C-alpha cells in the first residue's frame, strides 16, 4: 500500500516535521513483508530501546544524531546509511532535528540470501553517495541489500545514460543523492533533484534518464 502521491518529486523535509519535544513518524509504503517509514525527531529527543524481528536500515536526510545498537553508539548525519540487525536492542537520539528514512523487514528470514557491501558489515554509518563512483558513459549499480522481499541499490548515471522502460514487481522508492534524474512513469516525465524522492508504482512501466547531468540515486524495492 502506497500512502503518498506516486510518480512525482517529493521533498520529505516538507512532508514530515517535528515541533519541540515531538517525535513524528509516517509510514509511506507498506507491503506484506517490508515497509518504508519516515521519522522526524526534534532536538534531543529519543526513540527508546527496542529489538525487531527483521533488519532495519536507516538513511538520514536531515540533521545528525546517534543510533545506539546494544549500547554501542553510532553517529549518523545527513547522507549517511546504517544497518541495524534483527534482534538487536537499539535506540535513536537526535542531536538536532533528525529526519530518517526507515526501511524495515517485518519478519527476518535467515534462510534468505542477503548480498551486502562490506560497508554494511562494519556496523557503522557511511556516506551513501560515496558507495558508487561515476564512470564515463556508464551506469554503475551496487546492491546494499538483495533479498526476495527487499532490495536496496545505489546507482550512478553518467550524463546521457538511461534505463529503458521496464516494470518492477513491487513499489519502489527512489531518493536522489547527487545531481538530478529524469523519470518517466507510464509515459509521463518528471524531474527528481538531490534531496528529493519519488515512488515508482509496481507493475507500471517506468524509465530513468540522466538527461542534463550525472546523478546518483538510492532505489528501494519493497514487496
Model-identified regions with their sequence ranges:
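A short, N-terminal "cap"/entry segment at the start of jelly-roll beta-barrel domains
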Residues: 1-33, 77-78, 97-99, 106-149
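Ligand-binding loop in jelly-roll beta-barrel domains
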Residues: 86-111, 202-223
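Conserved short histidine dyad/triad with adjacent acidic residue
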Residues: 21-24, 35-52, 137-141, 151-168, ...
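Short acidic-glycine-tyrosine-enriched beta hairpin
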Residues: 71-87, 186-203
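Short strand-coil-strand connectors
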Residues: 32, 68-72, 95, 184-188, ...
